[in-house]
Amino acid sequence: MARYTGASCRLCRREGEKLYLKGERCTTNKCAIARRGYAPGQHGQNKKKLSEYGLQLREKQKARRYYGILEGQFRRYFEMAVKKKGITGENLLQILESRLDNVVYRMGLAVSRREARQLVRHGHFTVNGKRVDIPSYLVKVGDVIAVKEKSKSSPKMQSNKEYAAGRPRPKWLEYDAEEMSGKVVALPAREDIDLPIRENLIVELYSK
């Protein structure tokens, strides 16, 4: 299955809420949800009541789209979550939050998860001093994520550094603005994850 390459705004309209796929644009009146808050397509304005399965499926799709993950990988994360101790749904969100591209976004060094994924792929970040260009890399407590030294002076990273200065960060991440680096000081708890995801519906869907 290929990665989605269409218009990001269509995904937000499909889910009926902002997925913040375009960074700051999503907070302005240019946002597609603000202008056309209904699903795309000929029958988008005709809302119909979803079945139980439909609600579960929509919640799973929404979570996938927040993090930019394909179905196969998302299911593997769910299987990992099942094997971990604790509540499966919360384990799943914890795994998703631990992806390197998400951590870069949470640090404020990318305006969206999509941009974070591109920056990681292009080799602009290190983990514990070693270059890592795999967006799905799962960070651990104690890991230090930093902008590669050669990349710090690039116009893009300097722009993102300024952007990061005004961004709130979750308490499980420490951020050093001068070094353009962050440290994972704890695993994210459910209350640290500010996304409107009903993970229990995803668990119900995959448990059938």
Swiss-Prot record:
GO terms for molecular function: rRNA binding; structural constituent of ribosome. The keyword Ribosomal protein applies. The keyword Hydrolase does not apply. GO terms for cellular component: small ribosomal subunit. Residues 98-178 form the S4 RNA-binding domain. Coiled coil: none annotated. One of its GO terms (biological process) is ribosomal small subunit biogenesis. Keywords: Ribonucleoprotein, Ribosomal protein, RNA-binding, rRNA-binding. It holds the Pfam family Ribosomal_S4. InterPro entries: Ribosomal_uS4, Ribosomal_uS4_bac-type, Ribosomal_uS4_CS, Ribosomal_uS4_N, S4_RNA-bd, S4_RNA-bd_sf. PANTHER family: 30S 40S RIBOSOMAL PROTEIN, SMALL RIBOSOMAL SUBUNIT PROTEIN US4M. One of the primary rRNA binding proteins, it binds directly to 16S rRNA where it nucleates assembly of the body of the 30S subunit. With S5 and S12 plays an important role in translational accuracy. Belongs to the universal ribosomal protein uS4 family. Part of the 30S ribosomal subunit. Contacts protein S5. The interaction surface between S4 and S5 is involved in control of translational fidelity. HAMAP family: Ribosomal_uS4_B. This is Small ribosomal subunit protein uS4.
